[in-house]
């Protein structure tokens, strides 16, 4: 990846609330399925904003920090997804998204960020990201002191 896009906690919450507004009225949803781990934080925000208490997970391993590797399904939520919002932080190449579509064909699949290759696989997203950009999520970063350039 040649570029980095840094996401702060407040920006993530703002984008997720924007997505939640598009998912109203909340009564049409049975629950949320969070794609672990990237979809866990957005799922918590969506659950709060929509008043949804039924939250499950599908656990798929496809990244090792910044290296994409083979998909492994570690845990599935039951059913075909009918009445459920499936949420992940990002759709990238579409590998994970296609697996989600195959497992939950009747779900409404949303992400916060979408890259061109995976965009056709999601029902809704908030932010367009160039394909060659790595997203640094707030849960992968910490705040630290930076020495002034002048050394004072």
UniProtKB/Swiss-Prot annotation:
Alphabetized UniProt keyword annotations: Cell inner membrane, Cell membrane, Glycosyltransferase, Magnesium, Membrane, Metal-binding, Purine salvage, Transferase
Primary localization: membrane
GO MF term list: guanine phosphoribosyltransferase activity; hypoxanthine phosphoribosyltransferase activity; magnesium ion binding; xanthine phosphoribosyltransferase activity
Membrane topology of the entry: Peripheral membrane protein
Coiled coil: none
Domain of life from the UniProt record: Bacteria
Keyword Cell inner membrane in annotation: yes
Residues annotated to bind GMP: 69, 92-96, 134-135
Compartments it resides in: Cell inner membrane
Assembly mode: Homotetramer.
Matches recorded under NCBIfam families: PRK09177.1 (NF006613)
Protein name (record): Xanthine-guanine phosphoribosyltransferase
Organism of origin: Edwardsiella ictaluri (strain 93-146)
Lineage: Bacteria, Pseudomonadati, Pseudomonadota, Gammaproteobacteria, Enterobacterales
């Amino acid at each position: 990846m040649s570029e980095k896009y840094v996401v702060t906690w407040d920006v993530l919450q703002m984008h997720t609330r924007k997505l939640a507004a598009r998912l109203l009225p909340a009564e049409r949803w049975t629950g949320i399925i969070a794609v672990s781990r990237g979809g866990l934080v957005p799922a918590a925000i969506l659950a709060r904003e929509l008043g949804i208490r039924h939250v499950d997970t599908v656990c798929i391993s496809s990244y090792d920090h910044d290296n994409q590797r083979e998909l492994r399904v570690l845990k599935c939520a039951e059913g075909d997804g009918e009445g459920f919002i499936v949420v992940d932080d990002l759709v990238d190449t579409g590998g994970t998204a296609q697996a989600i579509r195959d497992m939950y064909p009747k779900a409404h699949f949303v992400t916060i960020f979408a890259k061109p290759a995976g965009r056709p696989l999601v029902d809704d997203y908030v932010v367009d990201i160039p394909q060659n950009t790595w997203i640094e999520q707030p849960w992968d970063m910490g705040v630290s002191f930076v020495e002034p350039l002048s050394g004072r």
